[in-house]
From Swiss-Prot:
It catalyses: sn-glycerol 3-phosphate + an acyl-CoA = a 1-acyl-sn-glycero-3-phosphate + CoA. GO terms for biological process: CDP-diacylglycerol biosynthetic process; fatty acid metabolic process. HAMAP family: Glyc3P_acyltrans. It is a peripheral membrane protein. The keyword Transmembrane helix does not apply. The keyword Metal-binding does not apply. It is found in: Cell inner membrane. This is Glycerol-3-phosphate acyltransferase. A motif (HXXXXD motif) lies at residues 306-311.
Length: 809
């Protein structure tokens, strides 16, 4: 019998090797699930299926896991390395697990009595044939069931490329024995837990059934809230309710997604081709925390930063290949053009207008549609910045979608809602040339199919893409901690007292968590180093030395536990960047060696990639700048200076450190600079280390332009503390534009009005204005004293000269 079974498996191997692709989830289970290769493993499959076993074994061997067909040899006993939970034709038709499976569990538990160092790892595994959730009112059981031979053959042909093997978090038998004992009841408990786990796993991979679009529309149009809005629309426009209802249907049709599973499969193949054409791979980190949320039944809201139109596609592609359900995505109405609008809609996009202002019917329908998505259990994605960042920095959050998300929770959403911040990064952004033109004043080109094709056609070899899932925010937990009154059954007017504050606070925390999940790449680091040189050029040796300094700093003084730092050597990073197309980096040779420099037109483009990680280096840059300009300074004075500037940096760059953590952070920075010999530290005195002064100069450059902007605004206020806010913003912008021309500053955000507006708001929040809006010059002088020391005399004179000219006008 045993040999016949082996022969049968061998017969299955040949066709399945051609038809079914290896798709393990996660892709590196040993590392991502923290499995211990020195301890035995036992794989648990949901039901008896030799086909599934063959596919599962193939995936095991491809990722370096022990062969499931081999035995575990423990204390002279030879025990199976895999078990099937259920024998039935349908998923878990029988009430209990297979008796032989219980016996195997019992034997493993008994061995834990004999060996105190033994810790068998029980690993639930399931094979997913396709990921279609089906449609509402569709008959049939979930797809996690034993298929007949013919059904399996059809599934292998049709879903072979979309078959996934899902490895779950291991259960420690040692933990089970220590906590619950080792009698036979524990074996049955293990089996029950595994059954529940497999059911949850299937739902987390496919999501709820897809809606019947027409039935969903009818339900929404019959809701009291939308009916009231329709009646108000009819009265306001003096039209019949029937006509207003037709308008409501048009709005719903404009907004709503029309998800099609087969469309997703086709899109997956197209996207696989696209990534292979454009990029050298997609690096994904921390997907396990999202899989855990899905298994625990959370409603997941993905909130990524917005770098490119391709973000929409990238995140859905990544989630699909991480065994998660692609979300419904809030996309700008500008993307609803032929033919991609229909493709996006079938892939889960629902479209949103740029503004809801003055259109109550539209805003009501959109809000109710979003609430319905939450109610039905669909994951949702939206870009909290509202649009793509043209500068590479995070934009101030637009809170409308977050407000509607919180409203859905307050309306009685039963499942917990967790917001997952997502950092998306690229070594080359498709639209970066367009961004540079727009920042120089060119009109934004309207999206259309021709534009998309032109962009894709001319680009290839763009390096890597990065997706890092940040620390989730479970809304109910956040509200319990910060706004405990949220559970009280209050009227909308009373709720507004804390509701708006909560929306702003959560939105800000999302931005902070996105920055905490930054994925640093070779382009970010190389751009940062070259832009730190006034000539945008460094010798090859200087550049490699600076790259190594950045890399070691991020490894030894990590910004957060979620940050991703390149592991390649500086030489390999530079070699990689030079091989990419359209980066604008040139290598020249002279009698002394090689010089690496930026092309004249590439400096603005490179600031985009520097700005992606500017928040990681702004504090060490400030410390370096203070030491460089003072030449020798006591550590307490450095801490004092940093503490005065930090509130503005924290607000502008969404920094994560609290004021209580700031001193420790600065001390860690100083310790690392001393270790790298960038500075010298004698007792409490910090000073320049002359042999490494060039490195200190490069480190200090990261904050230079930010401090110059602060100095502009503060200097205007010192001249006239009563300057109206609108004039203050306008004059600050004018001075910055002049400074950028005279001193060759290429950073596109340097004279951005929004940046000055945010700084002025921070000044107000920190108490630098009185109730009448008059600046407190005594308090401003504290900042000026610091800025006067760390900004060059030449720049200070240019700023003061420009301000004097404004006063003359």
């Amino acid at each position: 019998m045993f040999s016949l079974l082996n022969m049968y498996r061998k017969v299955l191997e040949l066709p399945l090797s051609f038809l079914v692709k290896n798709n393990p989830i996660p892709h590196h289970p040993i590392e991502e699930l923290k499995l211990d290769p020195t301890q035995p493993m036992v794989y648990v499959l949901p039901y008896t299926s030799q086909t599934d076993l063959v596919i599962f074994r193939k995936n095991c061997l491809s990722v370096g896991l022990p062969d499931p067909l081999e035995k575990n040899e423990i204390e002279g006993k030879s025990l199976p390395r895999f078990v099937f939970l259920d024998e039935g034709r349908r998923f878990f038709k029988s009430k209990g697990a297979k008796e032989e499976t219980i016996q195997v569990f019992n034997q493993y538990l008994e061995l834990h009595h004999q060996r105190s160092d033994l810790d068998v790892q029980i690993i639930p595994v399931s094979v997913l044939w396709g990921r279609s959730p089906g449609h509402e009112k569709q008959s049939g059981l979930p797809q996690l069931r034993l298929l007949s031979g013919l059904q399996k053959f059809i599934a292998a042909v049709w879903f072979g490329r979309d078959t996934f093997v899902r490895f779950s978090q291991a259960v420690s038998l040692r933990y089970m024995v220590n906590e619950h004992g080792s009698d036979q009841a524990i074996s049955h408990k293990l089996a029950r837990v595994a059954k529940i786990h497999f059911s949850k796993q299937r739902i987390s991979a496919t999501g709820p059934r897809l809606p019947n679009r027409e039935a969903m529309f009818n339900k929404l149009l019959a809701s009291p809230t939308i009916l009231d809005a329709i009646q108000d629309e009819a009265k306001a426009k003096n039209i019949s309710e029937e006509k207003a209802t037709q308008e409501a249907k048009k709005i719903l049709d404009e907004i709503a997604a029309n998800v099609n599973y087969e469309g997703l499969r086709v899109a997956d193949r197209f996207l696989r081709w696209l990534w292979n054409k454009l990029y050298q791979g997609i690096d994904v980190q921390n997907a396990d925390r999202v899989r855990k949320l899905a298994l625990d039944g959370h409603e997941i809201v993905y909130v990524p930063c917005h770098r490119s139109h391709i973000d929409y596609l990238l995140l859905s592609y990544v989630l699909y290949h991480q065994g998660l359900v692609p979300p419904h995505i809030a996309a700008g109405i500008n993307l609803n053009f032929w033919p991609v609008g229909g493709m996006f809609r079938r892939g889960g996009a629902f479209f949103i207008r740029r503004t809801f202002k003055g259109n109550r019917l539209y805003s009501t329908i959109f809000r109710e549609y979003l609430a319905e998505l939450f109610h039905r259990g669909y994951s949702v994605e939206y870009f909290i910045e509202g649009g793509r960042s043209r500068t590479g920095r995070l934009l101030a959050p637009k809170t409308g979608m977050m407000s509607m998300t919180l409203q859905a929770l307050l309306q009685g959403q039963t499942r917990p809602i967790s917001v997952v911040p997502v950092y998306v990064g690229y070594e080359h952004v498709l639209e970066v040339d367009t961004y540079a033109k727009e920042l120089r004043g060119a009109a934004k080109e309207k999206e259309n199919a021709g534009l998309v094709l032109r962009v894709i056609k001319k680009l290839r070899n763009l390096g890597k893409g990065y997706v890092n899932f940040g620390e989730p925010i479970t809304l109910s937990n956040y509200l319990n901690q910060h706004y405990p009154e949220w559970k009280e059954n209050t009227q909308a007017e009373e709720r507004a007292k804390w509701f708006n504050q909560a929306v702003d606070s959560i939105s800000h925390q999302v931005m902070v968590n996105i920055n905490k999940a930054a994925a640093v790449n070779a382009m970010n680091l190389t751009g940062t180093a070259l832009l730190s040189s006034r000539q945008r050029a460094l010798s090859r040796e200087q550049l490699l030395e600076q790259l190594e300094s950045y890399q070691q700093f991020l490894q030894n003084v990590p910004y957060s536990q979620d940050i991703v730092v390149p592991t390649e050597s500086p030489e390999k990073m530079l070699e990689h960047i030079l091989q990419l197309e359209r980066v604008g980096i040139i290598v020249e040779k002279d009698n002394f060696g090689e010089i690496v420099r930026l092309e004249r037109n590439s400096a603005v483009l490179m600031t985009y990639y520097r700005n992606n990680i500017q928040h990681l280096f702004v504090l060490p840059s400030l410390v370096a700048s203070i030491v460089l300009h003072y030449e020798a300074i006591q550590k307490p004075l450095v801490l004092e200076a940093v503490s005065k500037i930090y509130p503005f940096l924290k607000s502008e760059l969404f920094l994560s450190f609290s004021y209580e953590e700031l001193q420790d952070r600065v001390n860690h920075i100083i310790t690392e600079f001393e270790r790298q010999e960038v500075i010298k530290c004698n007792a409490n005195m910090l000073s320049i280390n002359k042999p490494r002064v060039r490195m200190l100069q490069l480190w200090s450059s990261g904050v230079r332009e930010i401090l110059q902007r602060y100095y502009i605004t503060v200097s205007i206020l010192e001249k006239d503390p009563a300057t109206p806010r609108a004039s203050l913003e306008k004059d600050s912008q004018s001075v910055a534009q002049r400074l950028s021309v005279l001193h060759g500053i290429n950073a596109p955000e340097f004279f951005d009005k929004a940046v000055f507006s945010a700084f002025i708001a921070s000044l107000k929040q920190e108490g630098y204005f009185n109730e009448e809006g008059i600046a407190n010059t005594e308090k401003l002088n504290e900042i000026t004293e610091i800025l006067n020391q760390v900004i060059s005399t030449e720049v200070c004179l240019t700023i003061k000269g420009a301000i004097a000219k404004i006063e003359e006008e």
